[in-house]
Structures are given as C-alpha cells and as structure tokens.
C-alpha cells in the first residue's frame, strides 16, 4: 500500500490488525458522535492564505517544560500500544526521539517504564490515572523518577470507564471475547507472528511490576474498572505533588472553569481533551472547546490539545485556536501498526511537511506567529 499522506496509515492498520485491536483504537464511546465531531470540526476550520511574505526562513521549533521540541507535537499516552507492534512502546518512543519530540508512556502500557526509558536518548513523559490503589500510584511515580521521566501527564477524565459499544461487537470485550480474539489472530498471520508470538509477554508491564504477577489482557478491563476512582478531586492532585516535583500536566480539560482551577492548583500545563471521544459522548470537540479555554488561561500555563488531530494542517489549526502544542494519539498508533518504528517516523515527517506548507502559505515564520489571524473564521462564525 502506498503511503503518501499522514491519513493513509489508518487503512493500512485496518488491513494488518485483528478487528478487536483495530476497533479498540479506532472507536469511541456510545454512538461516537464526539469521535466524529473531533475530526469534522477541525476540518471545517479554514486557514487564511497569505502570499509574498518571504518565507525563506521557517522554524517549527518550540519550547515546552524546559524542553526544545522540533515541532509542537508529542506522542500521546495510548494504552496497549505494545499490542499494535512488537514492543510497540519502545518502537514509538524511538521514532519520537529520532524526530525530536516527546513520547508519553501510558500507565497501561505493555512495556514497563524500565524497558522504554533506556531505549531513547531524550527524557520521556509519563501518564498516570487517579486510582483507588494509591500504593500503585506512588510506586509508579517513584519508578518514573528513577527512569528519568521529566513530565507527568495526569489524566483526570476517567473517574469511570466510558461505554465503548464497539469493543463488544469487535471482540475486545463482551460474550466469548477470548475465543473471538484467537480466531481473529489466526486470520491475521503477520500480526500473530510479529506481536502475538514474538511480542510476548503481553501483560501490562507497569502494573505487573507492582503486583508481582502478570496482568494480561483478560485482567485489563477488570483491574482498571475496579480501580478507577469516582471520588477524585483536586485534593488528590495535592497528594501527588508530595511525590512529584517536576512539570505536571492535567489532561482532560474541556471547560474554562476547570482550566482556571488548574491555574489555581499550580499545574504547569493542561491538555484540552475529550479522550479522543472515548469517554462521554456528546461533549464538545476539543477544537470547539479550545478557544474559550485559551481566552481564560493563555499565558498562565501551557495549553496542549488532542482529539481529532490527524494531519499537519490540524496541528496548525489547533495552534491557531490557542494551543501551544498538541498530542497525537490514534494517528501514531495507526502508523505503528502498519509499519512499526519506521511508520511512526514517516508519519512525523509527513506531519512536519504538512505543517511547513501550511505555515508558508499562511505567512507564519514561527510557531509563535500562528494565531487566530491565521484563520479565515472561527468555529461557528
């Protein structure tokens, strides 16, 4: 299959992956309304073309949490990344490091912190949930520190798991899920060999290291479901500050009031996010939520955004709407599933090229020059 655009990797991933894995990353919550609007709302934003601006000098570099990024992009935390390619978190982290952008390891990764961190030559980020098992949380923070993690991404929009109906249809969950997954793997021999056989162990490395026994796919939903904590409040974040003195980014902000509370708390950054449409269906897309949040807290902390970003044009749109940087989730997992580390590197190169074209043709010579003036109109205008 020819890959000529960043969006081509989705079809390539679907061909290679067993359905339960493809639909797990591709799907969203309930009727997937927000999942669709994330992409549609971004695509509806028109950029303002400008010409004859002498764009011979152009820089995509940006500074974030005392790090220099080659472009305002980081790879988002995605659970079970290691099921999409052999030791997938390591491959994705290497690709990100090679392109000069951060990689964020998920709490529920296949590869543990201690396997991923030594594989790259730049510090990585780590994502953590609020869980009932505070001992696990403290253990994860201590291990992250020891591994040289620089930035903590704290996910706050999962006090309960979202209802992802597509998972039950595809075999990720629901009746007879385990035998259905086995049958699907048998009809996808390339994945079965590369990941199913050579990619073992298939446990959740960060959790297994704490529990002292493997935490396999069968335990994944049960363990998380039993440990998500609906009593989460800002006091829990204060408790985390006792164990983490580095940059802390709060992921899952969609309302300006919550953004202001993050400033009061002393967060270093927020991620404007609806969890890729995987939690509460019917909420605002990140693109629609971002401008009001930027108006409320721009300059008081770093604003990142995710959900719906598939191309370099989308990155430029999010920056113009008020983000300082973005997180790529599904986009990099599609590329990883299709072509491993090389696929993720190529995806980032395509994103960079698309950004350069957009910046040249909107007259923005640096990331700092991308603003609302780069847009023909704002959403809803």
Swiss-Prot record:
Q: How does it sit in the membrane?
A: Peripheral membrane protein
Q: What InterPro entries does UniProt report for this protein, alphabetically?
A: Aldolase_TIM, Alpha-hydoxy_acid_DH_FMN, FMN-dep_DH, FMN_HAD, FMN_hydac_DH_AS, LldD
Where it sits in the cell: the answer is: Cell inner membrane
Positions that bind substrate = 24, 129, 164, 278
What Pfam families does the database record attribute to this sequence?
A: FMN_dh (PF01070)
Task: Give the stretches traversing the membrane.
Answer: none
Keywords, A to Z, come to: Cell inner membrane, Cell membrane, Flavoprotein, FMN, Membrane, Oxidoreductase
PROSITE patterns (UniProt xref): FMN_HYDROXY_ACID_DH_1, FMN_HYDROXY_ACID_DH_2
Q: What is its EC number?
A: 1.1.-.-
Name any Gene Ontology BP term.
aerobic respiration
**Required co-factors:** FMN
- Domain FMN hydroxy acid dehydrogenase: start-end pairs: 1-380
Q: Name one GO molecular function term.
A: L-lactate dehydrogenase activity
Catalysed reaction(s)?
(S)-lactate + A = pyruvate + AH2
Recorded superkingdom: Bacteria
Positions annotated to bind FMN: 106, 127, 155, 251, 306-330
One GO cellular component this record assigns the protein to is:
plasma membrane
Q: Provide the active-site residues from the annotation.
A: 275
Function according to Swiss-Prot or TrEMBL: Catalyzes the conversion of L-lactate to pyruvate. Is coupled to the respiratory chain.
Give the family per the record. Belongs to the FMN-dependent alpha-hydroxy acid dehydrogenase family.
Q: How does it assemble?
A: Homotetramer.
Protein name in the entry? L-lactate dehydrogenase
> Native species of this protein?
Pseudomonas aeruginosa (strain ATCC 15692 / DSM 22644 / CIP 104116 / JCM 14847 / LMG 12228 / 1C / PRS 101 / PAO1)
């Amino acid at each position: 299959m020819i890959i000529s655009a960043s969006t081509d990797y989705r079809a390539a991933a679907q061909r290679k992956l067993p359905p339960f894995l493809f639909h797990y990353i591709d799907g969203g919550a309930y009727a997937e309304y927000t999942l669709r609007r994330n992409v549609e709302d971004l695509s509806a934003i028109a950029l303002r073309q400008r010409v004859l601006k002498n764009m011979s000098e152009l820089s995509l570099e940006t500074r974030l949490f005392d790090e220099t990024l080659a472009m305002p992009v980081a790879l988002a935390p995605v659970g079970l990344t290691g099921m999409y390619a052999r030791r997938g978190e390591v491959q994705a982290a290497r690709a990100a490091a090679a392109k000069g952008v951060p990689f964020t390891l998920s709490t529920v990764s296949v590869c543990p912190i201690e396997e991923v961190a030594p594989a790259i030559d730049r510090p990585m980020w780590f994502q953590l949930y609020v869980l009932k098992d505070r001992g696990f949380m403290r253990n994860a923070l201590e291990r992250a520190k020891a591994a040289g993690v620089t930035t903590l991404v704290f996910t706050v929009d999962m006090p309960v798991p979202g209802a992802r109906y597509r998972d039950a249809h595809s075999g990720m969950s629901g009746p007879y899920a385990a035998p259905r997954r086995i049958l699907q793997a048998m009809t996808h021999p390339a994945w079965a060999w590369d990941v199913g056989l050579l990619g073992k162990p298939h446990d959740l490395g960060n959790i297994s290291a704490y529990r002292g026994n493997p935490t396999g796919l069968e335990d994944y939903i049960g363990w998380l479901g039993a440990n998500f904590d609906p009593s989460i409040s800002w006091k829990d974040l204060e408790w985390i500050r006792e164990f983490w003195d580095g940059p802390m980014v709060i992921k899952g902000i969609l309302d300006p009031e919550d953004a202001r509370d993050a400033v009061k708390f002393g967060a270093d950054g927020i991620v404007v996010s609806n969890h890729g449409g995987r939690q509460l269906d019917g909420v605002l897309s990140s693109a629609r939520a971002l401008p009001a949040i930027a108006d409320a807290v721009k300059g008081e902390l770093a604003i990142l955004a995710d959900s719906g970003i598939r191309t370099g044009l989308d990155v430029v749109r999010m920056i113009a709407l008020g983000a300082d940087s973005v997180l790529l989730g599904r986009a990099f997992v599609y590329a990883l599933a299709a072509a491993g580390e090389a696929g993720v590197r190529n995806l980032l190169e395509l994103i960079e090229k698309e950004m350069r074209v957009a910046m040249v043709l909107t007259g923005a010579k640096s990331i700092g020059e991308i603003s609302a003036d780069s847009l023909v109109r704002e959403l809803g205008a």
